[in-house]
Design a protein with these regions (language model features):
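Terminal leader/tail segments of proteins
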Residues: 1-78
Length: 78
Protein backbone atom coordinates (compact mmCIF):
# COMPACT_ATOMS: atom_id res chain seq x y z
CA UNK A 1 0.00 0.00 0.00
CA UNK A 2 1.58 3.32 -1.04
CA UNK A 3 2.41 6.05 1.46
CA UNK A 4 0.95 9.48 0.83
CA UNK A 5 3.18 12.56 0.91
CA UNK A 6 1.71 13.57 4.26
CA UNK A 7 2.43 10.11 5.70
CA UNK A 8 6.00 10.28 4.42
CA UNK A 9 6.46 13.66 6.10
CA UNK A 10 4.94 12.42 9.38
CA UNK A 11 6.99 9.20 9.48
CA UNK A 12 10.17 11.14 8.64
CA UNK A 13 9.42 13.61 11.46
CA UNK A 14 8.76 10.72 13.85
CA UNK A 15 12.06 8.99 13.00
CA UNK A 16 14.01 12.25 13.29
CA UNK A 17 12.54 12.87 16.75
CA UNK A 18 12.92 9.25 17.89
CA UNK A 19 16.58 8.97 16.91
CA UNK A 20 17.37 12.67 17.53
CA UNK A 21 18.85 12.86 14.05
CA UNK A 22 17.89 15.61 11.60
CA UNK A 23 19.78 13.98 8.71
CA UNK A 24 17.13 11.24 8.30
CA UNK A 25 15.23 11.58 5.03
CA UNK A 26 12.57 9.41 3.43
CA UNK A 27 12.63 9.07 -0.34
CA UNK A 28 9.80 7.72 -2.47
CA UNK A 29 10.57 4.58 -4.46
CA UNK A 30 9.34 3.83 -7.98
CA UNK A 31 7.64 0.69 -6.66
CA UNK A 32 5.33 2.81 -4.53
CA UNK A 33 4.88 0.15 -1.84
CA UNK A 34 7.55 1.65 0.42
CA UNK A 35 9.98 4.52 0.96
CA UNK A 36 13.75 4.45 1.38
CA UNK A 37 15.31 5.67 4.62
CA UNK A 38 18.56 7.62 4.30
CA UNK A 39 20.88 9.04 6.96
CA UNK A 40 23.12 11.83 5.70
CA UNK A 41 22.45 10.65 2.14
CA UNK A 42 23.33 6.99 2.82
CA UNK A 43 20.63 4.34 2.32
CA UNK A 44 19.99 2.41 5.54
CA UNK A 45 16.59 0.78 5.13
CA UNK A 46 12.99 0.80 3.96
CA UNK A 47 9.63 1.73 5.53
CA UNK A 48 6.55 -0.27 4.50
CA UNK A 49 2.94 0.70 5.20
CA UNK A 50 0.50 -1.96 6.40
CA UNK A 51 -3.23 -1.73 6.90
CA UNK A 52 -4.98 -4.52 8.76
CA UNK A 53 -8.40 -4.52 10.41
CA UNK A 54 -8.70 -0.78 9.77
CA UNK A 55 -5.45 0.03 11.59
CA UNK A 56 -2.41 1.47 9.81
CA UNK A 57 1.15 0.72 10.87
CA UNK A 58 4.57 1.44 9.40
CA UNK A 59 7.40 -1.12 9.51
CA UNK A 60 11.02 0.01 9.35
CA UNK A 61 13.29 -2.69 7.92
CA UNK A 62 17.06 -2.28 8.20
CA UNK A 63 19.60 -4.90 7.17
CA UNK A 64 23.06 -4.79 8.74
CA UNK A 65 25.84 -6.48 6.82
CA UNK A 66 28.31 -8.41 8.96
CA UNK A 67 31.20 -6.80 7.07
CA UNK A 68 30.00 -3.37 8.30
CA UNK A 69 30.19 -4.35 11.98
CA UNK A 70 33.18 -3.22 14.07
CA UNK A 71 35.79 -5.75 15.14
CA UNK A 72 35.18 -7.30 18.53
CA UNK A 73 37.72 -6.12 21.13
CA UNK A 74 39.84 -8.86 22.70
CA UNK A 75 38.28 -8.07 26.09
CA UNK A 76 34.87 -9.13 24.74
CA UNK A 77 35.92 -12.54 23.39
CA UNK A 78 36.12 -14.17 26.83
Amino acid sequence: MPLTRSEIWRVEKYLRNLFRLDTITLIERTKGDSVEVHVAGEFIGVVFKDEEDGEISYAFNMAILEMDLPELPASRTK
